[in-house]
């Protein structure tokens, strides 16, 4: 027996559930299927379709006004779809025509692109560049094994700009370093060629001229090109910024390059294909080399403040720490020592990755004097460093087999008979054909320099590192709170190398110059207590201190054997430098190795020149990144500027006329599209509103149907229960009847019960009766009544809910309007479409503009014809004089009195032509002109009366006032050409 609940349940116990229960999705699918079947059955009926939902009127008032059946509804539906399709096709055609006209009007700029199709911006990044095939392109392709220049597109004409967002998405503001194998392969070919021809050099003389000289000297220039499916991404704008600042030492672990503008090309710029080691390069390479002088990004860096860091930030290309110049696969090209100056590992070779970041830039030799850097004369005698920089390559340099001076104006060239290719030296037994004795002032030169402390983001100034005994405790000389990442948080009042205990707990060595300028800060996480314990453990340093003694600029400690502790070559702590006799090692404090045994005196190293063609190409190729594309097409559109300039005024006028016509057509198209868009918007809004109401009504109808389904299920359960109770009642009545019957039989048989058995003297067949114990577990009449009451309550509640849902469904169904009523209810279309009444005026205006345009065209044609008819062209006539020529000059007869004898004969005035004479002359000119023999006869013949009137007005004035003038006109017979009389003498037009 179940307990009564607040929410009605569909059944009272599990055994009373119906045998099949359908889900809500199945019910909806069944409803949709039935609705579709009804629509298919009723499509062919003339009476039309009825409503697909059923409304139940609980109030007993059925709707009397049934909608009339629209027999044209199927036709209207298909007709509307056809109209919409036609409008869409018309709109697409109009847009296509518009785009075609716009494309036709725009002229190409002789600039074609490479169409890249891939992810995310048309390309994929290639990280392993050694697997990319490459070829060279040059003019002398048959001699050097390259392809001709036309084999690949010119990158200056055919490229594609890559957006900044795509660059940031692909490269994450990190333009990486790539060790390209292409220059290494060329260097390998040169080495192989030199080894194969080494025996032949001994037989050659200085007069022998080899074509290989052009290649060795770098005169053979070409491009590197990659085939499909690869391309090159050439950077156009870039800058550098620091990354991963070490909080202990303050140096930047990485210097990243952010490329903000790039182009996709197929070939690189022109560069020397091969060359030996040299100092200066040709002026053709100056722009490419200058591009590698990368500036710092416009972010908050200390080096950008000229007041804090004189000279600004570093400019150049940073070869990252850990880069391999010559990979392991081509280790035979390394040689014993690096010939590239600062481009070397910690052992001075190229076997290991770089341990220090190396900067390469085009040198600025403007401040050099006699081949030496600025302030070189102020250095200590014999020293190779000045202003914190140790210079290599000052003096004698190796250039294309010659020893030259670092002073370009001296012109020293001593041929050594040796050529350096990479790390190997090859003999060259005859003098090359090139000349190096010229003044190479103004030629671009590579400069390789290293910041050993790697604090380029803080300052570009190089310093002389402090020795470990030239320090003092900064008591009272350092004020403020500064750190390795914040040099501006403190001030110094005295020059020196001050050992300072920072607020973070570590030790700092603050380098102060000029009593107030902080030029560097070196730090470590080791605190003062730990350092002092190490210091006290040094031999004979128990009573010593690090206080400053002496009056020098830097000062020193009292005992040189008790300087700042460091780790010796055995990695043990010591406070004294190693000695050998009277000589003592100079040990310095380094920013990245505070406790190490550092012997580098200067924080910077610089090298001038010394790069061969391999490194030259390697540096220029860092501007490019290899990408992989799915497909690209080349196309060259040659539209020279002279082609456009050669067009005459005729073509320009026709083009302007076409543009005006296109403008009028575009206005008409836009007006039509606006009308179509307005109609489409209205129908779309109406459809949306009607769909919204329909969706609500259908949802309510579904809810009502669900409630009715629950009522039916509950009724079915109640009927089952009643039927079961009736069967039980029948069984009980039958049992009572049988019991009474048997009792009567027992009485008649005179039997008695003994242990549930009937003992009688009658036969056993008569006394064998049915056992009725199986009915003992049946429910009682009281339980049955309780279940019936629960069913009645459940059924009544479900009926009330079903009635409410049906009422809501009726209300929502009545709210479903037709399309136009939905539009009127959603928007105030009376004001929205008030402009529709002006459509006839708009159409009239457009038609008027078209008519006005046609009229203007006709008038322009008439004016052109009028100008041609008005301007009378005279024919050239050759006059043959048959009368004899009088050689003697006769006395002139001057009738105007200039000779003293005036003529008394009245002067004959030329009378003005009458209107009839002008008409005859004009008509005769018209008949003999070519205008009357074409289709333009009728438009032009209407101009003849106006032309005659105009000529008559020119001769007689606007109202004939020229005839009434009595003033004698002056006639200049020499300067004025008289017009022949048209009534007698006619000229040919």
From Swiss-Prot:
A lipid is attached at residue 862 (S-palmitoyl cysteine). The record marks 662-663 as: Cleavage. One of its GO terms (biological process) is symbiont entry into host cell. Keywords: Cleavage on pair of basic residues, Coiled coil, Disulfide bond, Glycoprotein, Host cell membrane, Host membrane, Host-virus interaction, Lipoprotein, Membrane, Palmitate, Signal, Transmembrane, Transmembrane helix, Viral attachment to host cell, Viral envelope protein, Virion, Virus entry into host cell. Residues 860-989 are cytoplasmic. Residues 663-683 are annotated as: Fusion peptide. Residues 729-745 are annotated as: Immunosuppression. Residues 695-745, 786-821 form a coiled coil. The keyword Transmembrane applies. Specific enzymatic cleavages in vivo yield mature proteins. Envelope glycoproteins are synthesized as an inactive precursor that is N-glycosylated and processed likely by host cell furin or by a furin-like protease in the Golgi to yield the mature SU and TM proteins. The cleavage site between SU and TM requires the minimal sequence [KR]-X-[KR]-R. The transmembrane protein is palmitoylated. It comes from the Viruses. Glycans are attached at residues 140, 161, 206, 258, 298, 364, 381, 387, 403, 435, 439, 470, 475, 481, 491, 501, 515, 527, 537, 542-543, 551, 568, 703, 771, 778, 794, 828. Residues 1-106 form the signal peptide. The chain crosses the membrane at residues 839-859. SUPFAM superfamilies: Virus ectodomain (SSF58069). The keyword Membrane applies. One of its GO terms (cellular component) is virion membrane. Residues 107-838 are extracellular. The surface protein (SU) attaches the virus to the host cell by binding to its receptor. This interaction triggers the refolding of the transmembrane protein (TM) and is thought to activate its fusogenic potential by unmasking its fusion peptide. Fusion occurs at the host cell plasma membrane. The transmembrane protein (TM) acts as a class I viral fusion protein. Under the current model, the protein has at least 3 conformational states: pre-fusion native state, pre-hairpin intermediate state, and post-fusion hairpin state. During viral and target cell membrane fusion, the coiled coil regions (heptad repeats) assume a trimer-of-hairpins structure, positioning the fusion peptide in close proximity to the C-terminal region of the ectodomain. The formation of this structure appears to drive apposition and subsequent fusion of viral and target cell membranes. The mature envelope protein (Env) consists of a trimer of SU-TM heterodimers attached by noncovalent interactions or by a labile interchain disulfide bond. This is Envelope glycoprotein gp160. It comes from Maedi visna virus (strain 1514 / clone LV1-1KS1). The lineage of its organism: Viruses, Riboviria, Pararnavirae, Artverviricota, Revtraviricetes. The gene is env.
